[in-house]
Amino acid sequence: MSSDLKSRFLQVYDTLKSELINDPAFEFDDDSRQWVEKMLDYNVPGGKLNRGLSVIDSYQLLKGGELTDNEIFLAAALGWCIEWLQAYFLVLDDIMDESHTRRGQPCWFRLPKVGMIAANDGIILRNNVPRILKKHFRGKPYYVDLLDLFNEVEFQTASGQMIDLITTLVGEKDLSKYSLSIHRRIVQYKTAYYSFYLPVACALLMFGEDLEKHEEVKNVLVEMGTYFQVQDDYLDCFGAPEVIGKIGTDIEDFKCSWLVVKALELSNEEQKKILHENYGKKDPSSVAKVKELYHTLNLQGVFEDYENTSYKKLITSIEGHPSKAVQAVLKSFLGKIYKRQK
C-alpha cells in the first residue's frame, strides 16, 4: 500500500465527514456539528486502517490494472464504511469492558465531557454507514447486496460479542466453559466476518461478482480471521504495550483467550488449580501467577507452532482457488498479518 494511496484514503474520510455533518436529514447547529466532528475524528481514523485500505487493495488486485479516480473514491468509501462500523463496535465494546485505553489514548467514554453519551455516539456511528452507502452507491446494481452484506456482518459481529459476554460472565467465573470450539465460535463471529470477509466481499461486489459464488473465499477469510485473533490473544499477554498501543487485560477480564484455552488443555491438575484460582482476578499477583504458568507451559512455543501450521494450511487453501486474482487478494491479506507484532 503506497503512502500516496493512504493519503488519498484519508482525504476521502474528510469528504465523507463533511457530508455527514451537513446531512440534510438533520438540522445541525454549531454545537451538534462540533460534537459529531470531534467524535468522528477521535474514533474513526485513529487505527491502522487495515480493514478500510484492504478494500482498495483487493479491488485493485481483482481489476489487475490502474484504478480510475472514481474507482479509488468508491473503494475508499466502502473501506471507510468498515472503519465506521469498527469504530461503532469499539466505542460500545470499551464501555462494556470498562476499558481505559484504546489505540494509545483514553477510551472515548472516559473523556470527562463524554461519559455515557458515548452509547448514543455508537448508535450515530452505526447510522452513518447507511447514509454513506445511500449517498454514493444508491444507483449501483450491487446497492442492495451491499446493504444486505453490512446488515448481515453487523448481526454476526453483535452475536459474536454476545457469546463472548455471556461466556465470560464475571459473576460466575467458570473456566470449565472454555474450550477451543467456544473460542473459535466467538472469534469467527465477533472478529473474522467484519475484519476479514467484509473488506474482500465489498471489493467483490464492486467488481460485479456474486457473493454466493464465493463461499470458499469466505471460508478461507474466516480461517484467516481466526488465526489473526489467536495472534491478538497472544499479543495481549506477550506483546509490548508500547507496540500494540494498549495494555492487555485479558487475564483480569476473564476473557476466553486462546492462551487460557491452551493452558487448560496442557495443564496437570495442580496447574489447573492455579488457573481456576487466579484467572479473572484484578490483583497483579494473580495476573503474575497466570503469566508465570503460561511461561512454564511454553505457550510461546505452542503459539509459534500454531502460527506455522496455520500459515501452511492457509497457503494450501488459497493455492487451490481457480482464480489467480482471488489468490492474489487472499495472499496479500495473509502477508499483512503473518508474524505481525501489533
From Swiss-Prot:
Name recorded for this polypeptide: Farnesyl pyrophosphate synthase 1
Example of a GO MF term: metal ion binding
Metabolic or biological pathway, per its Swiss-Prot or TrEMBL entry: Isoprenoid biosynthesis; farnesyl diphosphate biosynthesis; farnesyl diphosphate from geranyl diphosphate and isopentenyl diphosphate: step 1/1; Isoprenoid biosynthesis; geranyl diphosphate biosynthesis; geranyl diphosphate from dimethylallyl diphosphate and isopentenyl diphosphate: step 1/1
Record bears the keyword Transferase: yes
Superkingdom of origin: Eukaryota
Catalytic activity: isopentenyl diphosphate + dimethylallyl diphosphate = (2E)-geranyl diphosphate + diphosphate; isopentenyl diphosphate + (2E)-geranyl diphosphate = (2E,6E)-farnesyl diphosphate + diphosphate
GO biological process: cholesterol biosynthetic process; farnesyl diphosphate biosynthetic process; geranyl diphosphate biosynthetic process
Name of the gene: FPS1
InterPro entries given in the database record: FPS1-like, Isoprenoid_synthase_dom_sf, Polyprenyl_synt, Polyprenyl_synt_CS
CDD domains for this protein: Trans_IPPS_HT (cd00685)
Residues that, per the record, bind Mg(2+) 2: D93, D97
